Amino acid sequence: MPKLKTSKAAAKRFKVTGTGKLKRMKAGKQHILTKKSQKTKRNLRKATMMDPSNEKNMKKILPYL
């Protein structure tokens, strides 16, 4: 059986925590920020965990992460 390929696009966007969960940054912080409040922009700086419903699919495209 051949080696599994890691999705490089996904590997750059996700990190694995010590418990095996996937950590990601929130979207919406790159541009069009003038109409967003300070509170919204502050909350977008925080990392969050991947939703459990997507985690199974992500583990397939990140086999060695």
From Swiss-Prot:
Molecular function terms, GO-annotated: structural constituent of ribosome
Cross-referenced SUPFAM superfamilies: L35p-like
GO CC aspect terms: cytosolic large ribosomal subunit
Coiled-coil spans in chain: none
Family statement: Belongs to the bacterial ribosomal protein bL35 family.
UniProt cross-references to HAMAP family, sorted A to Z: Ribosomal_bL35
UniProt name for this protein: Large ribosomal subunit protein bL35
Organism, as annotated: Lachnoclostridium phytofermentans (strain ATCC 700394 / DSM 18823 / ISDg)
Originating gene: rpmI
